[in-house]
Amino acid sequence: MPRLLLLFALLTPICGLALYLAPYARSQDVPFKLYSLFATTFDRKPTHSPDVGSLFEAGAREFKRKIVAVGDLHGDMHNAQTVLEMAGVVNSGGHWTGEVDLFVQTGDIIDRGDDTIKLYHWMDQLREEAQAAGGMVLSHLGNHEWMNVIGMSSLYVFPSEIKTFGSIAKRQKMLSSGPIGKSWAANYTVTSRVPLHRALGPPNTDYDPALAHSPLSHAALSFVHGGLAPSYPDLTPFPSRINALGHSLLHKLQARDPPPPHPPHPYPGLPEDATPSEHRLYATDGPLWYRGWAVDPEAEVCAKVDEVLGKTGTRRMIMGHTPDFERIVSRCGGKIIIIDTGICHAYGGVLSALSIDYTLTPTSERGWREREVVTAVYKHRREILADDVREFQGDISMN
């Protein structure tokens, strides 16, 4: 009898623990420590197939990341806010929703519209709101930002926009030593490498070719205004080499006295102390002006794209600059995506944003399934441009 009482005393807490865990038997929310205790007590593996992502490894749960990108805005605050709201980046009041992890803008906020000051101020506001919510805003300098810091081109600047600054001189000062110019120097880059998974590090972590054969080595996207040309000599290390050149050239341009508007005055050009690499940055095959991915024949670009993706450690390159007024353009199976659709009222193109939804799901102790859904978001419809699934084996940190 005493032995029976002892056996009953030992089994009671174990059975109670089993009853506690029963509701979680097929849920990813099983408390891992309790599950481990339960399994150890019985000293055997479960006879059923558990939900992966919570049972076989602490923290090995499904990982998700949502990225939204928008192209050229050209001085149109109303259309910009409409686009960001329909993509879930901001609410009706223009504030960060927290529904996306990263928002990327590929440059050309300035010119062709009157809302330059409002737009740059709004981008800085969203940058702060995103950071406070655990998100991020990545901003890029387009060729129009560079044209203005080199010397204002009166071909693209409306007189009504100049009035919002007060005068041409005040506008030039705002873009050099004023709040907009300071934000360019602090918060804007020429290009970005955005990882789809945090195991690759934060945005703009350089691609390491030594890791080329690891499962997630190229699980990243490149963003730039114009394009990353195959002939461009400063692609690597990516993206730090290009961004260092951009930072150096911007500093030199902002430090010189602003030249008078061109035309009617002569084109001022780059500073005398600009290096050959800085000149190449601003050349036709540089990342600010290159249009080949958008305009060259399909067979030609598809034959070259993998070389650039390999060097930059990315799966897709996303850019603005070359507008298609009806749609976001996807080429070579979604490896090339051009997101400038002429959003501003000066162009009258379609309102659009690009959404990238990435999911990494554990399928076994070392097995994983990636899914990347790339969607063109329009005002009244959505179009899936790519829906890629990939399975692999490997040790991936989910923390």
Where do the PLM segments sit?
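Feature recognizes metal-dependent phosphohydrolase scaffolds
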Residues: M1-N399
